[in-house]
Amino acid sequence: MVEYYDVLGVQRNASPEDIKKAYRKLALKWHPDKNPDNKDEAERRFKEVAEAYEVLSDSKKRDIYDKYGKEGLTGGGGGSHFDNPYEFGFTFRSPDDVFRDFFGGRDPFSFDLFADDPFDDFFGRRGHRANRSRPGGSFLSTFGGFPAFGPTFSPFDSGFSSSFGSFGGHGGFSSFSSSSFGGSGMGNFRSVSTSTKVVNGRRVTTKRIVENGQERIEVEEDGQLKSLTINGKEQLLRLDNK
């Protein structure tokens, strides 16, 4: 039987912070899209990691699991437990839903550089990561050579810095949306992310598209295209604006 603490590689007295860090690391490692050549095992591991996190990150579920094991949550234990709110069975969520919720609704495969770091809220280190960076390529470079943003960009590093900088301050974040899809091969992967911020009274929309190994970033201000970057190279624009 699967032992959730072993799945996450943590001790039984692990703190909530330890459990979050373990899930983050393993979910990224075993995400099926990152393991196209080992998809069956990746899907199994990804599901196990999601189940373990869903139980151990919730104090009530974790307490029941510690007392009765997985059967205490699924209703398969011996008899009824008067203090078990999941007496009639707890239903696990989709591992994709757990993954999406953990990353704040943002798809890491269409990570938006211009939005706030999604891990600030989880690890409480906002304002303490100013110039930290790590050498090495982008996480996206593991997807068959997708272009990286630069030698220090790693979207899943809790302390990454980007050469793109930021729009400055908290400019009134309006919205964020993303989507991605792809098969087991690397020739049909596509991800799209769009974010909108209000900066100094101007509506700034950033769209990032990764498709078939090519990355395209478009930045618009009040509906007008202001910059276009393809595979890390800024393109010259012919703007007919008055």
Curated annotation (Swiss-Prot):
GO terms for biological process: chaperone-mediated protein folding. Residues 3-69 form the J domain. Keywords: Chaperone, Cytoplasm, Nucleus. SUPFAM superfamilies: Chaperone J-domain. Signal peptide: none annotated. CDD domains: DnaJ. GO terms for molecular function: Hsp70 protein binding; unfolded protein binding. It is found in: Cytoplasm, Perinuclear region; Nucleus. GO terms for cellular component: nucleus; perinuclear region of cytoplasm. InterPro entries: DnaJ_domain, DnaJ_domain_CS, DNJB2/6-like, J_dom_sf. The keyword Chaperone applies. It holds the Pfam family DnaJ. Has a stimulatory effect on the ATPase activity of HSP70 in a dose-dependent and time-dependent manner and hence acts as a co-chaperone of HSP70. Plays an indispensable role in the organization of KRT8/KRT18 filaments. Acts as an endogenous molecular chaperone for neuronal proteins including huntingtin. Suppresses aggregation and toxicity of polyglutamine-containing, aggregation-prone proteins. Also reduces cellular toxicity and caspase-3 activity. PANTHER family: DNAJ HOMOLOG SUBFAMILY B MEMBER 2, SIMILAR TO DNAJ HOMOLOG SUBFAMILY B MEMBER 6 (HEAT SHOCK PROTEIN J2) (HSJ-2) (MRJ) (MDJ4). Homooligomer. This is DnaJ homolog subfamily B member 6.
